[in-house]
Amino acid sequence: ALQDKDVDVVYTDEDKILGPDWKNVNPNFKPDFNIDLLRSYNYITHFYCVKTELIKEVGGFSDKYDGAQDYDIILRTTEKAHKIAHVSKILYHWRMHSNSTAANPESKKYCHEAGRRAVEDHLNRMGIEAQVQLSKLFGGYRIRYATPGNPMISIVIPNKDHYKDLDLCVT
């Protein structure tokens, strides 16, 4: 992926390392790029490589998202990237100790709100009308997309000769 000149962004899988013997724990096998999943939580996090030109184009890191600068830069660079590559190998090992966010993500709660703002601003830049709410799952976000107008919803319930089952489905 790094040899492909068309790739703007590369990210890899990761795990955490624990203790003096550097034991590998909590492997994080990430999916290929999925913007809807990324808007719900920062699944990319570490070992994220971006072309220098792209970092310059988006204006680099922003203090506006203190604690979630990585999430913001990932959102802004993937907005502009033409080709995003996922290397499905664990190439990043995150050291975990008692005081690190690797061991206790909730130790920096302000990061969660900063991430929410980063997603909200991303959606605004993309022209998507939505509200971003903090999820009950720390580090996750719920996106409530606006539904313009009053769209009709059709439901197809295949029930053939079981018409009484239809009543159960619609009441």
What are these regions (language model features)?
Residues 1-25, 53, 88, 95-97:
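Conserved donor NDP-sugar-binding/catalytic core segment of glycosyltransferases
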Residues 23-53, 66:
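A recurrent flexible, glycine/aromatic-enriched loop bordering the glycosyltransferase active site
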Residues 37-43, 103-110:
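Acyl-group handling in specialized metabolite and lipid biosynthesis
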Residues 59-75, 110:
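Donor nucleotide-sugar recognition loop
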Residues 63-65, 75-95, 99-101, 116-138, ...:
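Catalytic donor-sugar/metal-binding loop of nucleotide-sugar-dependent glycosyltransferases
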Residues 72, 151-156:
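Cell-envelope/extracellular polymer assembly enzymes that use nucleotide-activated donors
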Residues 162-171:
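Short, well-formed alpha-helical segments that are part of the catalytic scaffolds
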